[in-house]
Amino acid sequence: MSFNHKTIEELHDLLVAKEISATELTQKTLEDIKSREEAVGSFITVSEEAALKQAAAIDAKGIDADNLMSGIPLAVKDNISTKGILTTAASKMLHNYEPIFDATSVANAYAKDMIVIGKTNMDEFAMGGSTETSYFKKTKNAWDHTKVPGGSSGGSATAVASGQVRLSLGSDTGGSIRQPAAFNGVVGLKPTYGTVSRYGLIAFGSSLDQIGPFAPTVKENAQLLNVIASSDVKDATSAPVRIADYTSKIGRDIKGMKIALPKEYLGEGIDPEIKETVLAAAKQFEALGATVEEVSLPHSKYGVAVYYIIASSEASSNLQRFDGIRYGFRADDAKNLDEIYVNTRSQGFGDEVKRRIMLGTFSLSSGYYDAYFKKAGQVRTLIIQDFDKVFADYDLILGPTTPTVAFGLDTLNHDPVAMYLADLLTIPVNLAGLPGISIPAGFVDGLPVGLQLIGPKYAEETIYQAAAAFEAVTDYHKQQPIIFGGDK
């Protein structure tokens, strides 16, 4: 018997009643992972021995009835540090790296007696939108194995969507949680910048990165955010604000809520059927008592260009530490120090990572800094101001998560610009440091469509409230791919 159809609350009740043990739940989860892994390829590492050892220890002391997450398995994206478990960032550069410390988000999960079941596949160093740049494998979409799962947190999304695990962690720099959540029909939240500590996250774009949760439902997503969100003195960008319970508004009605629908989010490049899906969702919110009105975010069209200058510049700086000297891969054909640097980085990084390092180095160079990096920072401010103006009058922003549904494997990985444009609708949220969620909102050609809800900073509770209200009157989250046991 598989437990992957049970909610976290249902699993908790079974554990407290001793109808199952943490060890049995872990064993069943490992079986679910193994039976589906060949089809989807969600994991780089499955930490079977460590997980069973941890489960046995939890059983020995007993399940805490007041701790919802006690004994619950968790999959973790492979750019989040896990002590004693390989953390590769899906790169040859770190293919054998085993950290000696846990990321704060992982430590918080351990503190709640969650069981880290394994590390999920991703785009190398989180640079990509399809999980095709991984050094190890290409993950496949849970709904159609000829399609991409999205990225960069593709493995974390497919692990939940395919029923391998109930909960997982990802990271979002320009849409890397929300886009794969949309492509796989699950709930993925990018929290407000600073809500979840970045300590132990292998950095890509330090002013953009944020760890966040994946789950099958809105409430379970909020329950996982309750675990990982915390202020942290180890992270200089950690926010002091701490909401006690992100589920507190779930179940409340949304009568009187004002929701903005930016005309730019339904314009050029958006699949007409996705536009129809979003407009239908807007009518559903109106039926629930909310007001939905068209607004403008005029500078959002510059988001992709701004993002790839800023993110690549930050990446070129962050990735300087991978030099073949201290840890990770070192080229064995080097004869001197210069060759160690050059050969290690040439051989250790994949093409997309090298492309972004070069772009970032160029943008930061003395002759071009003002024209590119400085200018990008100025336009970023304009994008932030656009959001501020809208949120002065509205509670949330509504729109599609992605311009299209999941595209085919090996169709965009040789066209960087087309791949970058797939993040058109998610990038502005990271540039502004805002919270954003993707929830299932329909299907086009049998593939899931994600609906994005964006809020002002620290408005996760309101986002969850609206998302849960929509979820309660639709059944998209209940529909599952064949690999999970569904009929699609």
Curated annotation (Swiss-Prot):
Keywords: ATP-binding, Ligase, Nucleotide-binding, Protein biosynthesis
Family matches, as HAMAP family: GatA
Record note on quaternary structure: Heterotrimer of A, B and C subunits.
Protein's organism: Streptococcus pyogenes serotype M5 (strain Manfredo)
Family: Belongs to the amidase family. GatA subfamily.
TM helices/strands, residue ranges: none
Gene Ontology annotations for the cellular component aspect, listed alphabetically: glutamyl-tRNA(Gln) amidotransferase complex
Active-site residues, as the UniProt record annotates them: K77 (charge relay system), S152 (charge relay system), S176 (acyl-ester intermediate)
Catalysed transformations (reactions): L-glutamyl-tRNA(Gln) + L-glutamine + ATP + H2O = L-glutaminyl-tRNA(Gln) + L-glutamate + ADP + phosphate + H(+)
Organism superkingdom: Bacteria
GO BP: any one term: translation
GO molecular function, one term: glutaminyl-tRNA synthase (glutamine-hydrolyzing) activity
Record Gene3D superfamilies: Amidase signature (AS) domain (3.90.1300.10)
Job of this protein: Allows the formation of correctly charged Gln-tRNA(Gln) through the transamidation of misacylated Glu-tRNA(Gln) in organisms which lack glutaminyl-tRNA synthetase. The reaction takes place in the presence of glutamine and ATP through an activated gamma-phospho-Glu-tRNA(Gln).
Protein's name according to its UniProt entry: Glutamyl-tRNA(Gln) amidotransferase subunit A
Pfam families per the UniProt record, alphabetical: Amidase
E.C. no: 6.3.5.7
